[in-house]
């Protein structure tokens, strides 16, 4: 969670209560449950029209995958910020930078989806792809339309998130402790 507005004391009490609740759980079991949820969500997304109209939140490499990294980091390591994953050798500083840039890109797209739909939504429709690519100043080139360049950038970003999520789980389950893994 993050404090946006309201009573900071009440927010602090809420965060403390969540930490206590999480602390009482088996971290490995919680991590495994998140992995099962992730696999089921990814299996569902394969083969549907998500490539033409991707779901920015629930799709493979979407916002939910970043949330999974954050939740498991809290369960397993009591780490609440992505950048702190460098301290236990999960990611390099460059990987964190890439992950945060991809996250920001997806959040920007999602905000435009909400704006253009005038409601909550996570599917990047073909109609909104064109609108958002223009808002983000993607220009047509000789051999490629601006919207195509935008969609390529989107797929590069979701592929990066998916790759870093897989790295996260591989290190989590193949190393006695991610802290022991040397990373460049």
Give the role of each language-model region.
Residues 3-27, 38-47:
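Long, amphipathic alpha-helical stalk/connector segments used for oligomerization, subunit docking
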């Amino acid at each position: 969670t993050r404090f946006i507005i309201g009573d900071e004391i009440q927010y602090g009490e809420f965060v403390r209560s969540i930490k206590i609740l999480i602390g009482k759980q088996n971290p490995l079991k919680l991590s495994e449950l998140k992995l099962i949820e992730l696999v089921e969500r990814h299996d569902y997304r394969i083969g549907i029209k998500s490539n033409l109209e991707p779901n920015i939140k629930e799709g493979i490499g979407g916002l939910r995958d970043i949330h999974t990294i954050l939740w498991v980091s809290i369960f397993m390591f009591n780490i609440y910020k992505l950048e702190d994953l460098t301290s236990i050798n999960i990611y390099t500083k460059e990987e964190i930078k890439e992950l945060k840039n991809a996250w920001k890109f997806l959040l920007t797209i999602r905000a435009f989806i909400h704006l253009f739909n005038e409601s909550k939504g996570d599917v990047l429709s073909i109609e909104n792809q064109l609108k958002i690519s223009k808002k983000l100043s993607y220009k047509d080139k000789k051999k490629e339309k601006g919207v195509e360049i935008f969609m390529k950038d989107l797929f590069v970003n979701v592929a990066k998130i998916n790759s870093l999520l897989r790295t996260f789980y591989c290190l989590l389950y193949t190393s006695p402790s991610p802290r022991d893994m040397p990373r460049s």
